[in-house]
């Protein structure tokens, strides 16, 4: 602090603070540091601590900027004595980047022509970029980001459409494909006469649809099947999808529409329902198939790896299949699982294996977690069997039951499979009914009626 007592001696020295303050751009901290003389070298360095000079190392940026170094003698960078000369060479002119001969070249400066560290950068910034010519200016897109065709694309820019580094980013920022530049005015095209397309729905009025020639474009109408346009009684016309087009002989179990029906076979819309769907006739072919067979080609389409030195794949040994396929690291023996010649599946998609033990889980819960790969039987019990052909209870034969008798005769009459009872079944029933009608009333019944009539006569006489 004794430096304040010797202003004359300080004035004789070359104070680099004059050069520092002659150029703009200092912060509010650097100028007072220079006035206080908190520097370590000959450029106004008081204080007893000396900083190491390492000419082969880069300059200590913090020391050049503030005049002090927190690491002291342990700092591994260079601390020149004449700090003012170094800063004067760096800031020879306003806005110039430092030229440090013998130091590595600033790669960011060589690519972009700019340096975000400015005068504090510790690398060399040659005046002539690269091969002796001036650094070519970076071309910018209309979005304001640099275009560098030879560099890697900026992943953040491709993901978000923005880049926080802006002009200093060293990656390429291509223009998105959807936005190739400012929108240009479309050229006016003279409308050309187009051949009229034959419509398959003549009741649709084309005046309500704007013409495609107003926009200079040629639009085509989507193709519909014949009869897909219907007039709805509740509002505007309705267009049905191709899957709902009515035609004769429609069956819900047919695969697909293989050909377009002819207009002659088209049923009239008025005789159909509101949506033009033809109801199924009673004579339509019913789906009576309960089981389906799995072709054996599916089992041979996969080949599993043979690894004798590895443990066996337990899933393959249990089900005969492996979801990992050729990438499974376990052994898949060929002779472990017998070849599948054909599997018969039930209506719920479980295998039927006559002669094999029944699946206990399916017998208890009605489901099987292994599905078609289960090796046990999944046959439905006789009490739970269902026949799709028995569609109504009215079709089932009903045996006649006599009204007057509590039970039939001792020997039960045979029941016919047809709806009409046979002669042998009707004869004992009729005879029992006749005998019941001709039977006299019991005595108790006649006595009760006599007592009731006597009580009525006594009340009237009194």
Curated annotation (Swiss-Prot):
Residues 1-13 have a biased composition (Basic and acidic residues). It comes from Arabidopsis thaliana (Mouse-ear cress). It comes from the Eukaryota. Its main location: nucleus. This is Zinc finger CCCH domain-containing protein 34. It is found in: Nucleus. Residues 1-26, 288-310, 405-462 are annotated as: Disordered. Pfam families: zf-CCCH. Gene3D superfamilies: 2.30.30.1190, Zinc finger, CCCH-type. GO terms for molecular function: DNA binding; mRNA binding; zinc ion binding. Residues 288-303, 446-462 have a biased composition (Polar residues). PANTHER family: PROTEIN PHOSPHATASE RELATED (PTHR12506), ZINC FINGER CCCH DOMAIN-CONTAINING PROTEIN 34 (PTHR12506:SF60). A zinc finger (C3H1-type) spans 54-82, 100-128, 148-176, 307-335, 353-381. One of its GO terms (cellular component) is nucleus. Residues 405-418 have a biased composition (Low complexity). Transmembrane segments: none annotated. Disulfide bonds: none annotated. Keywords: DNA-binding, Metal-binding, Nucleus, Repeat, Zinc, Zinc-finger.
